[in-house]
Amino acid sequence: MKTGKKLLVVVDMQNDFIYGRLGSKEAQEIVPAVREKIRHWDGDIMFTMDSHTLPLKDTFENHAIRPHCIEGTEGWKLVYDIKEIYDEHPGQSIKVKEKYNRFGITRGSTTRYIDYDYIEFVGTCTDICVISNALIARSENPHAEIHIDANCCAGTSPEMHEEALNVMSSCLIYVDR
């Protein structure tokens, strides 16, 4: 691993992606590992949160995927085990986003991928938001060492999770298994 400034990006660990409308057994299974990763992380941490408001905007996502992560609902909130750890790390940022990647941010800190030498991603969904953010990080910061902790990610299905990991690996992103 490179030495230098480190960032852990915790992607969309929200109730709707874990236990709710878009949840899965695989997503539920990663919660303890993500919690431990955050607890022992030695660097900055950024949490992203998918966020939609009512009435839903006329976007492809809102037509293609069931309504989810409606701001202010239980489904929108970070899962309890992750929120508890977030509360133990004052000063870490939450980026609320309306798109798959952090460039859709409407509120949040000014954390930028270019500011880091080592970036690691965990969370949901491997094949949507995790891959989007990881590829943008690769594009924004071609010199960073970028990692995906495959055991701390879950996709929309086990097959799509594996496909996304393969694509990221082919784009010079380290996939740690």
Task: Cite the ranges covered by each PLM segment.
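Internal catalytic-core helix/loop-beta-alpha segment
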Residues: 72-128
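Catalytic metal-binding/acid-base residues of hydrolase active sites
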Residues: 14, 51-53, 100, 125, ...
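Active-site acidic carboxylates
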Residues: 1-96, 162, 166, 174
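Histidine-anchored nucleotide/phosphate-binding helix
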Residues: 33-40, 131-141
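A short acidic, often aromatic-flanked loop/helix-cap motif at beta-alpha or helix-coil junctions
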Residues: 54, 77, 100-104, 154-156, ...
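Short, well-ordered secondary-structure micro-motifs
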Residues: 57-59, 105-108, 132-133, 159-160
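Structured adenosyl-cofactor binding patch, chiefly the S-adenosyl-L-methionine
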Residues: 137, 153-165
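A short glycine-rich beta-strand->turn/loop micro-motif centered on a GG-aromatic cluster
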Residues: 120-127, 143-158
